[in-house]
Swiss-Prot record:
Family listed: Belongs to the WD repeat PAAF1/RPN14 family.
Assigned GO CC terms: cytosol; proteasome complex; SAGA complex; transcription factor TFIID complex
Protein name as annotated: Proteasomal ATPase-associated factor 1
Origin species: Homo sapiens
InterPro entries documented for this protein: G-protein_beta_WD-40_rep, WD40/YVTN_repeat-like_dom_sf, WD40_repeat_dom_sf, WD40_rpt, WD_repeat_multifunction
Tissue: Ubiquitously expressed, with highest levels in kidney, brain and testis.
Function: Inhibits proteasome 26S assembly and proteolytic activity by impairing the association of the 19S regulatory complex with the 20S core. In case of HIV-1 infection, recruited by viral Tat to the HIV-1 promoter, where it promotes the recruitment of 19S regulatory complex through dissociation of the proteasome 26S. This presumably promotes provirus transcription efficiency. Protects SUPT6H from proteasomal degradation.
């Protein structure tokens, strides 16, 4: 992958005034970094600044919310996107997780201020406060219906909430350590949780009961993903007949991102190991790109792309900085990744440039969610940022 380009986090404000400047840099692996600047030469009648770049950099295109820059010497090209809107009043401290409902109307987020809130996705207006976890909430997500929320906390509890009246309808107990991530199986009759206690569990929402321990790996499970398996993949057979309360687990894979540098893939119904991959550092997050391709991100900044059919060697390893990879999300023909140094970027196969979501100034971007052409991020600086993409 080409050398990463970086830009001043508030470039859009800085270049809005005459002679305003913003710094730029290019970081080719194993070579000295290149540094430069952008300068505003004036504002056009359409409100778009006229911007020139210092030697070694080229401005390909600019509008109010985006600027496309190249560094020809390193064959690097990035389109930087400024937030369309920023929501600063949802939380008062670092926001650890967020999700957007399937119809795009609502957002849910959790914060180190001790709260979990539901808000209007269009303007950040507060709708509901979800109270009931003891200690911090680590993860929250909407069910496919968009009317119900699943959350996991440091109190080792998993809870299901009504987004309409903020009532907690189900509490799952059984984990012995904080819950770090969750996944929803199919339409949501079953859910999966991953915990610091080293186990992943399958739950029956209707009866609020544990259907079984899917894996017990003796190491904290930081991230989990469920995906439909390509029919060429052997998922193994269950040792005992699955419960009739298990719904939608067949032909599904379960991916576990583990603290002990291991990425584990299982048949969700069979509980049988499909592969175990050892990475360079603790795995923080993982996602499926297709029925056989997956991504997983590590604490030392590596993004591994693996093929389940031949998982011994990665298809590719993307490394843009040594900052921890904190979230990965599949999008059309590619993926979005966020890291602990504030970078958040989109790689799409059909584009010869990387799209960078700017605004966070070296603060970790913990989670990314999308709805149609909109991307939402949450950050340690306590802000939710919404970006508008022309094509996603």
């Amino acid at each position: 992958m080409a050398a990463p380009l970086r830009i001043q986090s508030d470039w859009a404000q800085a270049l809005r005034k005459d002679e305003g400047e913003a710094w730029l840099s290019c970081h080719p692996p194993g070579k000295p970094s290149l540094y430069g600047s952008l300068t505003c030469q004036g504002i056009g009648l359409d409100g778009i600044p006229e911007v020139t770049a210092s030697e070694g950099f080229t401005v390909n295109e600019i509008n109010k919310k985006s600027i496309h820059i190249s560094c020809p010497k390193e064959n690097a090209s990035s389109k930087f996107l400024a937030p369309y809107t920023t929501f600063s009043r949802i939380h008062t401290k670092s926001i650890t997780c967020l999700d957007i409902s399937s119809r795009g109307g609502l957002g849910v987020s959790s914060s180190t201020d001790g709260t979990m809130k539901i808000w209007q996705a269009s303007n950040g207006e507060l709708r509901r406060v979800l109270e009931g976890h003891v200690f911090d909430v680590n993860c929250c997500r909407f069910f496919p219906s968009g009317l119900v929320v699943l959350s996991g906390g440091m109190d080792a509890q998993l809870k299901i909430w009504s987004a309409e009246d903020a009532s907690c309808v189900v509490t799952f107990k059984g984990h012995k350590g904080g819950i770090l991530d969750t996944a929803i199986v199919d339409r949501g009759r079953n859910v999966v949780s991953a915990s610091r206690d080293g186990t992943a569990r399958l739950w029956d929402c209707g009866r609020s009961a544990c259907l079984g321990v899917l894996a017990d790996c003796g190491s904290s499970i930081n991230g989990v993903a469920v995906g439909a398996a390509d029919n060429s993949i052997n998922l193994g057979s269950p040792e005992q007949m699955p419960s009739e309360r298990e719904v939608g687990t067949e032909a599904k894979m379960l991916l576990l991102a583990r603290e002990d540098k291991k990425l584990q893939c299982l048949g969700l119904q069979s509980r049988q190991l499909v592969f175990l991959f050892i990475g360079s550092d603790a795995f923080n997050c993982c996602t499926f790109l297709s029925g056989f391709l997956l991504l997983a991100g590590t604490q030392d900044g590596n993004i591994y792309q693996l093929d389940v059919r031949s998982p011994r060697a990665p298809v590719q390893v993307i490394h843009r900085s040594g900052a921890p990879v904190l979230s990965l999300l599949s999008v059309r023909d590619g993926f979005i990744a966020s890291q602990g140094d504030g970078s958040c970027f989109i790689v799409q196969q059909d584009l010869d440039y990387v799209t960078e979501l700017t605004g966070a100034d070296c603060d970790p971007v913990y989670k990314v969610a999308t709805w149609e052409k909109q991307i939402y991020t949450c950050c340690r600086d306590g802000l939710v940022r919404r970006y508008q993409l022309s094509d996603l």
